[in-house]
Every structure is written in C-alpha cells, then in structure tokens.
Regions:
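Short tryptophan-centered beta-strand motifs in secreted/extracellular beta-sheet-rich domains
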Residues: 24, 82-84, 147-163
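Beta-strand-rich interaction surfaces with strong enrichment in secreted/lumenal proteins
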Residues: 66-74, 138-144, 173-174
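Flexible glycan-contacting loops in extracellular carbohydrate-active proteins
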Residues: 173-203
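Secretory/extracellular carbohydrate-interaction modules
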Residues: 55-124
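Short, aromatic/His-centered strand-loop micro-motif at the edge of beta-sheets
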Residues: 129-151
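Extracellular glycan-recognition surfaces and repeat-rich motifs
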Residues: 27-55
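Short strand-turn-strand beta-turns centered on an Asx-Gly dipeptide
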Residues: 164-169
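Extracellular carbohydrate-recognition regions
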Residues: 2-37
C-alpha cells in the first residue's frame, strides 16, 4: 500500500509542522495567499511555458515589485527551509531579495535572503542574513548570478543559516541570524534605466 503524502513527508508518530507549496500557475497570482506591493512595478503570470510568475520593474530608478504573506510570519527563525526556483532577466541596475523575512517591504527587517546585486556585491549570488544587531553577507563564490533558472535553498537552524544553489553549492553564516518569526518574500528593484524582471515558478517553505 502506498503511504499518504503526510506519511512520506513525516516520520511515523510525528505531527506535521507548517508547510506550503506554490507552483505559480493559473491565470493570476493567488492573492488569498500573497500580498502585492508595487512602486512602478507589476506581477503577472507569464505567457510562456514554465514561466511562472513574472515580476517586473520599469526604467524608473525607484521601481519596486514585491510579494509576501501580508506580515503573517508562520516560519521559524531556528528551524525552517525555503526552496525557490527562479531566474533573473537582468543582474545589473538593481537588486533582488528572495527569502524569509520579518519586515513588510523588500529586504526589510530581520531575515535570510538569496541576494543579487551585480554592481555592489559582485556577479555571484550572495547569502544575506540580518539579526537584531546587523547584517552579514556571504558570497557563493562560484555561482554566477546569470539569467538562467536556478534552485535556491535557504535553511535556518538555531546556530546557522545556509544557502544552497542548484543542490551543489552551500555557504553558511553563523552571525547576525534572525531572532524572530518570518514570512516568505520575493522582490526586485531598479536603480537605473534598466527594466528588471524576475520569473519564479516554484516556492516551498516548511518548518523543521
């Protein structure tokens, strides 16, 4: 007999913890789940195969496109995982944050993010953690922040945070870890006359 999905995901005798899976499919974003925030930005479902959600800015230097759980912080700072599959249309002229955070605007509050900003932090993905006393940046070193699809996995424990790209590169931070509960978030902004885009087609978050 095939086990239920519950039995496959959890050891026998245990009680499941919070988990959600988002495939970013259909004709519009599920606004019963996601809160949208835009400053000259948009979020629409991509009209392309496996395109997921297309987040876009304009050429305005203050353009922002951002989604989160409307400040419903359901995930633990000492035991949680976020997995996201996404690609950037451009890695210059702005920045992107994808991760778990306590704030309600892009990169705000405490949290842990997979971060891209080619002009400031180099042409690689960065792991950025923020705690009560400040932030810590760790470069992945060998994973270029290009315009291909990548799988990003962030994990938080009581003693460390880690970022894994495509299952084979992991960087770890043990300083400035978040000390409060967190919500999933995705955001891009623009700092020059470049129309930035980000496609995201899968996200999963769960408490461990």
């Amino acid at each position: 007999m095939t086990d239920s999905i519950y039995d496959q995901l959890n050891a026998y005798g245990t009680v499941a913890k919070q988990r959600f899976v988002e495939n970013f499919s259909g004709w519009q974003l599920d606004t019963d789940r996601w809160d949208q925030s835009n400053t000259n930005g948009t979020q629409v479902m991509a009209d392309s195969i496996d395109g997921g959600l297309l987040m876009s800015t304009t050429s305005s230097g203050s353009s922002i496109s951002y989604i989160d759980f409307a400040d419903k912080k359901q995930f633990s700072n000492t035991g949680s995982v976020m997995i996201a599959v996404m690609k950037h249309g451009s890695t210059t002229g702005g920045e992107s944050y994808t991760g778990l955070q306590s704030g309600t605007t892009q990169g705000n509050g405490q949290g842990a993010w997979s971060y891209v900003n080619d002009s400031w932090k180099g042409a690689v993905f960065n792991f950025y953690t923020v705690g009560a006393s400040g932030g810590t940046w760790v470069q992945t070193g060998c994973v270029t922040s290009d315009t291909n699809w990548h799988t990003h996995k962030i994990e938080l424990t009581s003693s460390a945070g880690s970022l894994q790209i495509d299952g084979n590169t992991t960087v770890t931070s043990t300083t400035n870890l978040p000390a409060v509960s967190l919500q999933p978030s995705v955001g891009i902004n623009n700092t020059s006359a470049v129309n930035r885009t980000l496609n995201i087609r899968y996200m999963e978050c769960y408490n461990t």
